[in-house]
């Protein structure tokens, strides 16, 4: 979240208080917000669990040659709302070779096909705490070479997680 005052309002406040020195505290606030309490961590985990469950349950309903990107998007949004999510910042569902490198696009009436990937990128919120998940489904049996690439990517993610420690940014 970002909070900004208009320049006009800030000038009025500063003019009305000539003996007070105003200092930009946004960096200090940003740093303080990076540290989460156990309660905040649990809120984030909670919304992530709901988001993950909505994606997985919807993924089980995908039928190649029948399901559209919009069907997938609606299914995820409905399940998230049922789970208690009060806001969805974005919900991207893309499929088909022409859209593999296209992020943050709206779901279309395009029917997903066997042998394709379906990418879901979503952020849901509960009480101001957000999830941010990306998941990929493959419709059919993943080819060997692509499984190997996925395993390599998974190893990179595991190494990055291992390197993460409190205080490291």
Region roles according to the model:
Residues 1-169:
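Active-site neighborhoods and metal-handling regions in enzymes and metal-associated proteins
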